[in-house]
């Protein structure tokens, strides 16, 4: 009864208006799983391939009709009548059908849409929430924790049309004891920041991830104005709220000169100088997490950065690790970073994603479940964060419904888990 009866795929649009893929998996017992796939703007070169049509006459080449057709034909035939409860087997069949290292033949977006939809159909068939089904797949025995959010309230880099180089300035409400409280704190700081920006004549339009995108004098100006917003909201920096940043340093890196350029400040740095620049910011502000603080290929630089900052704060690998267990193993062996960002579409199946999370957790690396800048209303990452006890989640600001959908799902999950449910507090950083 839990066998796959039918798969239907279609082209929909994401939060940037670009096409993406949505797939339904139907089981013989009537259960249905629905999943849609996000897309990134700043992407790691080693990510699994997102299949696009490249037809310039349609959606500027960004259509996904080819991916949809592959799901409706090749993938549908390959997994027809397979047991949806055997997630690993379903994913393995699709990986083998593709046959490439980066899923470039049939596309990570095609495969992932079916992988997630299968898990959702299986959860519905078992009459349990998706987070509970994921926890069973992941082998979680302990109580489930709510993830503490990193809330992106100033956007820069490739996520906004402004002059800020650092891609994300986030707040983490460490005071919060529930997800509801965390969201309230984030929302109040977000409102206050908007009022401050408006009073000072700055634009209060938002970027791809829902954060404000003002033109500021420098990257440090963002920390100063964020500090004001926190204080004016009635919270204490370092005690109630800390800062997290995503440098997306691969976007700042010149591979020919091996330097990092902050255009807003007209400064260039070697990898060692850029680490020292970040270290000075950590000393000055309560920054507790830095993501992609160097280019994905700058492993010698990352060794120095980890040695200098790895005992103080989270050093998160996004483009660095691309949710890939082979690359993460290398990072662990070489003491590179101490945290991995988890993005389902970087690797292309739920099984491989769970393997990356498990490897990180078994190696004492923190995990952060993440959205992408081009999102949909799909809330799978909320269930993934809870079901794996990841502890942290990045899903943008408290603005734009494709972002708030994930927060609202976390509220529902917390409600289902009950009043005794705890939020992640396993910090090791120094403030």
From Swiss-Prot:
The gene is eno. Binds a second Mg(2+) ion via substrate during catalysis. Its EC number is 4.2.1.11. Its cofactor is Mg(2+). The keyword Transmembrane does not apply. GO terms for cellular component: cell surface; extracellular region; phosphopyruvate hydratase complex. Belongs to the enolase family. (2R)-2-phosphoglycerate binds at residues 167, 343, 372-373, 394. One of its GO terms (biological process) is glycolytic process. Component of the RNA degradosome, a multiprotein complex involved in RNA processing and mRNA degradation. It comes from Buchnera aphidicola subsp. Baizongia pistaciae (strain Bp). Keywords: Cytoplasm, Glycolysis, Lyase, Magnesium, Metal-binding, Secreted. SMART domains: Enolase_C, Enolase_N. It comes from the Bacteria. Transmembrane segments: none annotated. Its main location: cytoplasm. Catalyzes the reversible conversion of 2-phosphoglycerate (2-PG) into phosphoenolpyruvate (PEP). It is essential for the degradation of carbohydrates via glycolysis. This is Enolase. The active site is at residues 209, 343. It is found in: Cytoplasm; Secreted; Cell surface. It catalyses: (2R)-2-phosphoglycerate = phosphoenolpyruvate + H2O. Pathway: Carbohydrate degradation; glycolysis; pyruvate from D-glyceraldehyde 3-phosphate: step 4/5. One of its GO terms (molecular function) is magnesium ion binding. Mg(2+) binds at residues 246, 291, 318.
